[in-house]
């Protein structure tokens, strides 16, 4: 069973998600990666949650999982078909994610990851949007750090709340 990438449907045949955030993402994400819309609408995956007991334990488990990722991709490669034809990849899903510019971690994290580095990384990631007054506002070329410093003119320089950070973190795909 092909489960990592829709093996049959063309992108144009997939209905758009009616949520307003997806309207903004559908418009803006292709600027950051040629296959961003395929990632949004035609991929799926299995997640693994790993508990940790301390920052040191987290760092060790993060490093191990990073090194194991290529093996996991190979073991679970099940998306060789795209639009009823061979895609030329055992994991077309992996190819799509390599052409989506909303995530991945700098290679420095692979050796020496800690909470502070991830927080700095997250605060420096460009934002996709802000949710304010029951509306998603597209934000381009601004980081969450800019938002924290009141430098987002699109929302009258309001300062972020915890819910804004949660929303931003939900748009960083690592």
Where are these regions (language model features)?
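Terminal catalytic/cofactor-binding subdomain
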Residues: 1-36, 42, 174
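Glycine-rich, histidine-containing beta strand-loop boundary motifs that form or position
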Residues: 2-6, 52, 76
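Short loop/turn segments at secondary-structure transitions that flank enzyme active sites
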Residues: 6-8, 54, 71
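Catalytic cofactor-binding cores of redox enzymes
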Residues: 14, 31, 52, 92-93
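Short, well-ordered alpha-helical packing segments
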Residues: 22-29, 49, 62-73
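C-terminal accessory/tail domains of diverse enzymes
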Residues: 39, 56, 60, 67, ...
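Glycine-rich, often proline-containing surface loops adjacent to acidic residues and nearby aromatics
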Residues: 40-51
């Amino acid at each position: 069973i092909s489960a990592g990438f829709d093996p049959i449907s063309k992108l144009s045949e997939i209905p758009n998600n009616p949520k307003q955030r997806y309207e903004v993402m559908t418009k803006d994400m292709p600027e950051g990666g040629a296959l961003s819309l395929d990632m949004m609408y035609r991929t799926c995956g299995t997640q693994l949650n790993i508990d940790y007991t301390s920052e040191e334990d987290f760092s060790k488990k993060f490093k191990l999982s990073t090194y194991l990722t290529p093996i996991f991709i190979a073991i679970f490669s099940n998306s060789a078909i795209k639009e009823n034809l061979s895609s030329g990849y055992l994991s077309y899903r992996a190819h799509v994610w390599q052409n989506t510019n909303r995530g991945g971690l700098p290679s420095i994290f692979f050796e020496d990851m800690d909470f502070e580095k991830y927080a700095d990384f997250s605060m420096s990631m460009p934002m996709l949007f802000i949710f304010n007054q029951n509306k998603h506002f597209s934000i381009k070329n601004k980081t969450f750090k800019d938002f924290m410093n009141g430098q987002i003119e699109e929302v009258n320089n309001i300062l972020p709340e915890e819910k804004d950070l949660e929303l931003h973190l939900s748009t960083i795909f690592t």
